[in-house]
Amino acid sequence: MQSLEKKILEDGIIIGNDILKVDSFINHQIDCNLLWNISRHIANKFQNVDKIVTIETSGIAFAVGTAMQFDNIPVVFAKKSTSKIVDDSSCYKASVKSFTKGSINEIRIDKRFLIEGERVLIVDDFLAEGNAALGLVDILKQAKTEIVGVAVCVEKRFQGGRKKLEDLGYKVYSAASIDAFKDGKPVFHRA
């Protein structure tokens, strides 16, 4: 998606060899026009979606934007922590390693919010090694839903997440796909 690639070139910051900081327009402050355009592009790539699933927190805005494109279908987000109001035994759970934080989280979704046979689209802000998406896939399989695909705003293709998901048979769409970082700039994937 040209407008996202342009924004990444203008405002994205590369840290080291594998981190792209986009907090000024995706995952701390959100550019709402960009969000709307990304959401529209995602919705155009998938059909017959009953529900959208993401993981807290940065994927939520893009999941909601995409859900609005599908006539306001529900969005469910996996939580990274427990609380007094959630009975952990009534949740589907999976362990997920955070690439940027280097920690492992047990994510969970209340069983009431995933219905067997539902067609579910996973939406997130980033795809790197694929850990978050694979954790959501695990939960959605436990719930016996049908996974329509995985859609992300930004993909760092060189980290292998897409391949893992495609090897499992899932369709993957990214609004901006990066093959590498070279001379402090992202090199965007061209089909």
Q: What are the roles of these predicted feature ranges?
A:
Residues M1-V123, L127-A191:
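PRPP-associated nucleotide enzymes
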